[in-house]
Amino acid sequence: MSRFSGALQLTDLDDFITPSQECIKPVMIDKTKSKTGAKITVQADGYYEQSESGKQKLQKVEITLQDCLACSGCITSAEGVLITQQSQEELLKVLRENQTLKASGDNDQVRTIVFTISVQPLLSLAHRYDLGVEEASRYLAGYLRQLGADYVLCTKIADDLALLECRQEFVERFRDNAELSMLSSSCPGWVCYAEKTHGNFILPHIATTRSPQQIMGVLVKQLLAEKLGVPGSRIYHATIMPCYDKKLEASREDFYSEVNGSRDVDCVITSIEVEQMLQAEEQTLQQFEPSDIDWPWTDQQPEFPVWAHEATMSGGYAEHIFKYAAKELFSEETPNELQFKALRNRDFSEISLEKDGKTVLKFAIANGFRNIQNLVQKLKRGKGPGYHFVEVMACPSGCINGGAQVRPTTGQHVRELTQQLEELYKQLPRSNPDNSYTKQIYTDFLDGAHTDKSLELLHTSYHAVEKLNTALNIKW
């Protein structure tokens, strides 16, 4: 079963290849003279060259995640390569090394270990271990501290900032050119697909606001580092996310800080990888001492450790921005609960605002690769349905059904599991991004809202990847 989202697995019919067959990245091979009659044998623990002079173990070829992001040879390269920096094995290795340094008293080399947990994995793990969501957050925090975490954070502050930045970006774009549809940017599977498949045509439509994961990266490596009095490079920042595509996002060069000399997010592990780590130890979450989620950002702390955002399960972009734009642009109040109308399938829905008999705002939510393809093709043909904003997620049902969420139990359908997670989500307290926490972050860290610093740290850019027509890309 593929681990990455549909948008990363497939573009055109001729696009699905694996690196072991046709990856176009050149690998430097040191040529050595060997005697005639040498042969290569493969054993369980590696590759060996056997000749009259004896056996020699050959070096393993490694292609990093960054190689795949910079390569237009295929959209699925990341599935078949050795992901050297985005795995539970690498995470556990770093944690063990850090514990050894602490034990030896080598404090100059010890790193501060920070974990950030997204809400969707909490839902998945709560369901898996039959816990309440808040309960699951405390047990998971306890488990991570047992592994060596110094801080365990939630994404609430970054979720709030992402909504505030994205809504302001939409209003500014609408006032400048109401005809240009704006597409959300928080899904890395969608962004990577857009860069590699539709390039310069689609990229101007995509919001520049960073995803909550990458906003957390900035806050951890800069604001938290400042509060702790350590350089950002001395913090190891790991996130727990609902999909493997987040590993690709963390590996983008755009999110490497020259100031800190490190990535904003060092490692991404997923819901299912947490489950695997627990299974390897023959443990469950309930077996660890519960611990509180940390809140190092502001003077006051939120009442709850875990929050929902609007009614949608992928951050609430369409709903929140629609409400804000209706009031900001047209002085129209909207209901607390918006009713999106499902169209051909449950993963594509829309809502509109009418004023004086005219449709002044039209928003949509497009989940899943099929709906993304249809949306992009309509935009390309100039026959789009006139959406001003579309919340785009590569996974059917959005982030709550991310490709790295814990799998259904035997006999349970994915849709049934998704509905159960949705019910858990609806029970969470609803966060309003216009709160004292975000206001303090803007004042103390970002020099205010809509400033050069907030634009630099909370926004990003995209890069069209040109298709390379090489012999390796030709299908016969």
Curated annotation (Swiss-Prot):
<dbReference type="GO" id="GO:0046872">
    <property type="term" value="F:metal ion binding"/>
</dbReference>
<feature type="binding site">
    <location>
        <position position="68"/>
    </location>
    <ligand>
        <name>[4Fe-4S] cluster 1</name>
    </ligand>
</feature>
<comment type="similarity">
    <text>Belongs to the NARF family.</text>
</comment>
<dbReference type="GO" id="GO:0051539">
    <property type="term" value="F:4 iron, 4 sulfur cluster binding"/>
</dbReference>
<keyword id="KW-0411">Iron-sulfur</keyword>
<dbReference type="Pfam" id="PF02256">
    <property type="entry name" value="Fe_hyd_SSU"/>
</dbReference>
<dbReference type="InterPro" id="IPR050340">
    <property type="entry name" value="Cytosolic_Fe-S_CAF"/>
</dbReference>
<dbReference type="Pfam" id="PF02906">
    <property type="entry name" value="Fe_hyd_lg_C"/>
</dbReference>
<comment type="function">
    <text>Component of the cytosolic iron-sulfur (Fe/S) protein assembly machinery. Required for maturation of extramitochondrial Fe/S proteins.</text>
</comment>
<dbReference type="InterPro" id="IPR004108">
    <property type="entry name" value="Fe_hydrogenase_lsu_C"/>
</dbReference>
<keyword id="KW-0408">Iron</keyword>
<feature type="binding site">
    <location>
        <position position="395"/>
    </location>
    <ligand>
        <name>[4Fe-4S] cluster 2</name>
    </ligand>
</feature>
<feature type="binding site">
    <location>
        <position position="187"/>
    </location>
    <ligand>
        <name>[4Fe-4S] cluster 2</name>
    </ligand>
</feature>
<dbReference type="GO" id="GO:0016226">
    <property type="term" value="P:iron-sulfur cluster assembly"/>
</dbReference>
<protein>
    <recommendedName>
        <fullName>Probable cytosolic Fe-S cluster assembly factor GJ13047</fullName>
    </recommendedName>
</protein>
<dbReference type="InterPro" id="IPR003149">
    <property type="entry name" value="Fe_hydrogenase_ssu"/>
</dbReference>
<feature type="binding site">
    <location>
        <position position="243"/>
    </location>
    <ligand>
        <name>[4Fe-4S] cluster 2</name>
    </ligand>
</feature>
<feature type="binding site">
    <location>
        <position position="71"/>
    </location>
    <ligand>
        <name>[4Fe-4S] cluster 1</name>
    </ligand>
</feature>
<feature type="binding site">
    <location>
        <position position="399"/>
    </location>
    <ligand>
        <name>[4Fe-4S] cluster 2</name>
    </ligand>
</feature>
<feature type="binding site">
    <location>
        <position position="23"/>
    </location>
    <ligand>
        <name>[4Fe-4S] cluster 1</name>
    </ligand>
</feature>
<keyword id="KW-0004">4Fe-4S</keyword>
<dbReference type="InterPro" id="IPR009016">
    <property type="entry name" value="Fe_hydrogenase"/>
</dbReference>
<keyword id="KW-0479">Metal-binding</keyword>
<feature type="binding site">
    <location>
        <position position="74"/>
    </location>
    <ligand>
        <name>[4Fe-4S] cluster 1</name>
    </ligand>
</feature>
